Curated annotation (Swiss-Prot):
Residues 31-40 have a biased composition (Gly residues). One of its GO terms (biological process) is ectopic germ cell programmed cell death. Residues 608-627 have a biased composition (Polar residues). Important for normal spermatogenesis and male fertility. Specifically required for progression to the post-meiotic stages of spermatocyte development. Seems to be necessary for normal expression levels of a number of testis-expressed gene transcripts, although its role in this process is unclear. It comes from Homo sapiens (Human). It is found in: Cytoplasm, Cytosol. Its main location: cytoplasm. This is Protein TOPAZ1.
Amino acid sequence: MRRPPPLGPTTASGPEGNVRNLQKRQAPGPGAAGGCGPEAGGCRENKQKRRMVARATPGRGEVESDKSVAASGAGKAARRQVEGRRGPVSPSDSSDPRGLEAAKEAELPLQTERHTKEKRKVTEASSDDPQPGLDLVRKESLTSSESFQTVECLQSLGKESIIEGIKRRIRNKKLKSLENPPLKITENEATQNIKVEFQDELYKNTPKYSCNILSPEVENNSVLKLRDCNCFPHSKGCNDENNLPYKPDGGCMHVAENFSKKENLRSLAEKSDTNSIPQLLQTEENVMGVNKLLPEESDLYQSKTNGLLSCLQHEKNKYSIEESSVGRKPRKRMKLSEKADETVTEMNFSNEYNKSELMLQENQMIADGKEAETKSPLNVLRKVSHNTVSLMDHLLSVPETVEKETSSEHHVNAVFQKTIEPLLKEETENASEPLGYESMASKEDFKSMKSFIGKSPNEYHIERRSSREDLRSASEELKLSCQRTIPMTGKRTWPYYSCARISAWCWKKASLPESSYFLRGSQESCRQVDVPKHQTNQTHLTDSKLLLQSSLTETNTESSSKEKLDSNSNCLSSVSAVEPTLMVIKEPIIKDDKKIKSEELSRRGSEVISNTTEDTQLTSETQSLTGNKKKARGNLTKLNLTATSKDGQEANNSAGKTIHRKACIAQQTFIVPDLVKILNTGRLTNFKIPLLKNKSEKRKEVNAKSSEREAYSPLELLDNLSGADVRQNRSKENVSMMMLGPQTLSIRNSVTPVQASSDSFYNKKSYSISPSFTKQGNNSKPSNHVSEPGNIVSNKEVASLTVENNAFSCDPGYVEKSPSFCCNEQETFRPVSSEVRGRKITKNFSEVGFPDILKAYEDDVLLIDVIQDDPDLFGVSNEGELSFTSEVPKISQEPNVAGEHQSTDSKYMETPVKKEPSDDLRELPVLDCGWIKPDICASNSAESEIKRDPKDVNTSLGEVANETSENETLGDFSEQIKGSDLDEKHRFTDKVITKEEKENIYEVCKSKDSRNADFMVGECQFAVPVPKPLCLLVPPLNLSGRQEDTILNTWMNDFRFLGKHSVLKLQNPETCEIFKREKNVGVFQKSLGLMIPYKYCKFHFNTLRGCERPLCKFAHVPEQGDEKVCMDVFKKYININELCLLQRAVNIFMEYYRKFPPGVYFDLQVLNDLLNSLLKHCLLKEVFQIVNLSIMVKMLPSLKILLNIFEYVATMKLRNAVPALIDIFCKLVEAGMVLDPEHFNYIVKLLYQVQASKQEITAVLEMKSRLQMRRFKKNWKCDLDSALNKLEHCKEKGDWTKLGKLYINVKMGCEKFADFQTFCACIAETLTKNYEDERPDIPFCEFAETVSKDPQNSKVDKGVLGRIGISAMYFYHKLLQWSKGRKVLEKLYELKIHFTSLKGLIGPEKLASRCQIVNVAAEIFLKSGSLDGAIWVMRESEWIINTPLWPCDRLDVLNRHNLLCTIAHEILAKSLYRQTFEVLQNLPGFQNSQETVEVSQYSLLFNKLLGSCIESSSLGMSSSVAEFMISKSIPIDFSFLRRLITSLGRSRLWLKARAHYKSALSLGCYPPLEGNLYRKLLLIPSYLSEIEMLLAIEIFMVSNASSIQSPGTSTQILQIVLKRCEDNQSRSNDDYQAAVERLIMAARISDPKLFVKHMTVNVNKEQVYSLEHCSALKWLKENMKWAGKVWLFSNH
């Protein structure tokens, strides 16, 4: 986290060098990112500082205690070092405020002396303290918060070599002041000198933090009071026990450190007057930043105090610019680094002094501005310091007690605001001369003046002792100063747990210096440090100033928010006094800012905007410091946006500025991680915050309540500047908050200021959120959290600001490495920012104390409520926009960040109004510049956009603003842009997104580009120094060449690590799927107003973007029967006329009509309109698809559509489309489309224009000739009335052939099938009605013959003829004209028309069942004597009677039964047994169970058939009939069955005989076989035939097979008894004797033969026979296999 000592004066030996070294030594700690950046030789410098302090300060223990009070974390390290040098000093966190209270209780003279001493001590201690931020804060709260802030600022700036140079100067001055502990006058002079020097350095290093910088003494007392008032207010809102538990590291970057600072400030506040509490409330926002930059806060506070005093002095001594030169002298000693510091101080001061005006001047006179501005700001600071004494005396009446001083400081703040306004104006005018840096320096000087004014006279004297160093430190602290201050009470008192707590009060400038390492403050510091480096490298302070200004501007833009955060942290110790002053300063600045804003927008862009906007917003509301701070903050944000963009352009010209931007970007990235975490923590966007609706009013109210509401100030400023600016300011505030969290993580000290700044930005938007959010802002994580939901757009801007600031924060080391610290800074910056941008904060973040941020977030849980997706507060796409802001700022880096802030602000303003897919910009915002660029150019990848440059980011910001409120944002933002050079590029942004529909497309691109952009930004955004991104189709915001260069460098120096994504993964389109796919789909997509059934996907049908679910459970294609839904969807899509919707309509049309035919809801006009819309969008391929499908479904488009297609192809010279078009044309003509000759001629002409081939033209001509041949005259072809008249004419003449031709013509010419059906019905009626019986001809037959001869005859024609034939058949059946009816049926048979499945066209036959139609036809044949015809009709109908598919009435069934029976009798009479059996088999009741008919009634028919078959010896037919009867349980005559069995046996058909015998046996035809079978006894009736007797003997043998085949059974006898018939005893003798012969015959016909022996006659005179054993055994051996199966097993 540390940097090597800066080259040149930065590392110069001496008190300042020692101080720097001391600060460097203090920097190392848990929060290495803390107040001081890494510097080579940090230990040596620390030792030197120690020696310096030992030499300079007699009482270091006291100073040490003060320092410990000022910053717990940094103070611990500092105390350890000081204790090593001075002796053990007990750490004092909450106890430190006691010392402050004691100091307050002391009389003013004593306080003055004590302040002088403490200031000396603090100066020495600060040089000694390795962690000036923490120790100084503690000591400052106890002894001299000013010196602490100075040291703290130096610590935060310690990463910059310039800061240490400043510290050394401050030490020298403080040593001098210690040596000269005179009264207020001496102190004031020394303070002024120290302030001048310190501010010069601080302004150089931390232009935005300079406001917080106060001389140690001045800050000591007044800081206690002011902290109580300004810092404590923030601490009230933000300070909790968590505030004190800051990390011992000097890098107040950790939230804990911030908390500790806040707590220290609170303790100071508690010790100080209760009046300080309101000030504390006002400074709560600053306190957030102070919490983050608490160590820096003291320095920043000193800078503020110095700046305030300088402002007051300048106000009183406006004409005494000479003192400013005094401040410059130390700068000169500082060499380039000091010069850079001075430049930074000047920049800060000028920023404070002239925000907008300085911006304009910055572009013109950077070098001159540096010197002149430095002089003027320093002079002003000194004057203000002197004036501050008087003003302080005036306002405070030089209260004896510190509390009195505190209250007076409050008054001073108020008065100073009033006084500073003119001063700021004057200074602004003066600063306008120096252009860039002067404006910033003047602004920072004003901040310092504010802080000086806020300080007590004692502090003022102390400040005079170290006026120059103090001024520098004051400038830095002023920059680092937070609007929210944490008292040194040891508790975090955030009276208002609102996001707004951190709002505008966070001094962007003030917070930036200290947090410049890792936060916006870090960015500032980096800028300042970079500026000295650049100065060293470039030799020109002007160049460094330009770089610083651009960087600062960018940093001020993001830094402003960061500074607010930083200033909040600084306010912990110093803002108490500084903030009231800052408030005063900011009000005049607001006025000036609004004026200057336009100038600065054009000139300084981000630089002045950040400072001016901050001050302006803060100053906007003079009634309440918080409100003023908020306003100033909002204004600063706006101005910073503009200035930042412009500065970004200028920065492009200078590497240093680029580095600063990068640092800012890195810081922004840091902020973004917290915000991302917050965003990730719980879709904060879901929480709605009504604050934004009445943005200006609520903002004012919130500002009055807390600094966070300062965001509303931008709304007020919106009227003056532009809605876009205001939105940008808000976005900046949100961004600042976002940046705050991550920055705090990244850098403890610098991050803390940055957090304060971010809190400031956050507070600006926190108005939308809540005080708790502001509180969270100090915690860094809470503010990020708040920024995410509520301030998405703003957060994006904030992110950009953060990025810029982070660039500085990370860049310090890099800047030290090289003036064009693009690569080094990028490396240094990248560690901090790599995670920051994605959601991962780099090691710096972890070091920064991310857990503290988490803790702060936990403390500020209310942020969740604030982050709700309130369109008024955050815009519809707050999430995406937040991501965008964080990402984009990173990309755009400082200048772009400013532009982005503006865009984001305006976008934010508008975003609340817009809740459409365009809100998906949220996703793109995630992508950084890449995201923005997608807005600008959807086709361009985010990666390319990222490569483009911060310009692209600016453009994207502009786009964002445009998207958010295209009109409002574009107008306002354009105005700002016009005021600055940004206008043109922002216009491009405006152009990029002009419509919500385009936003939709933009979202699509955004999702794609955003991924690329995010990836690029995360991995390569700043890693690769690329020129302006080529992807930027539209020119980016007009940035000065320097800014543009810087932007490019910033991209090159991206704080992120290559290959890593920024913390804001929510911004990644895929990550945003959480919000977009699931959430945005329902929340962000606007309904098209269609009434879609529940089963269909509402997103697919009813939204512009459609369904984005990978697997959707709802249908995307209408189902059969929902054709009306299709038509409604098509109509809606056609009305909207969006490309994506039309393509979706094509898909739906194709998928639906491929499956289902057109129905009653099909509207041909909708088809034509859809084709027209597709043609207008040049979707020729889709047109062809739909036309081809419409031809398939027989729904042809209109002729006009066809001609339009030809015209389009000819106009566009689409030669390749001609073959497909000709093919479609031929299909349409063949399908029935009618074209006139002139149409063909026109088509041929168009084909010649498109240079169609001769073959293609010939094809068209051939279709023309074919069409002419097929059609009749045009007057009647398609005219139904004419055709009907023709039909009547044919009827009258009986010219049925002509009627057939008329039918053919109508069929070819009629376009509507309904008309054709009507015409056919008329034909059927004509052929059936009013027909004379005398005429022998059959009209239907002649008509059908003519139609059938048509070569175009098709199935349709056959169907029509069949239906007309049925009508004719019914007609003749009704008239009992069987012969004519038979002729009709024969004609149908001849034409192979299956009429049985058709229905008639008219009359009852139109509703007749199929059974009825068949019955009528069969009856006609039967009546006409054609049995074959009747059977043909039955067979044609498949004998169907009643089926589910063809239901019929019972009457139809009865008619069928009678008809079939009649046919059977007639056929049987003709001995057609097979046909008869077929007819009988199809009687009702045999086909299905639905025919509830008793089949037993058919017994007579079947027995008659069976008998006839047996008599005719049709054994096969007889057997089939018998089997059917047995199977259907139809009663069978046993005599026929026995006869059948005998006949079959005698015919040697044994198989069938045995089967029927067995069936007959089961039916009871034969007496049952008793158990005698097993007793070797067989009883055979005498009436059986020989066949039946043989079958009985076979059963007997098979049944006794086991005993017959056993070896020992040969002696057994098988007896056969021939039973007599009792009924015929009279004839029994003859019949019985015949039976005996049949028995013997049966034995003989057996195979093998059986032998039967007569044994005896029984009592009944029945012959008894025995079956020879050997023959039976032989028969079984040969036949047992089949016999066993036949006789032993049942067939069923």
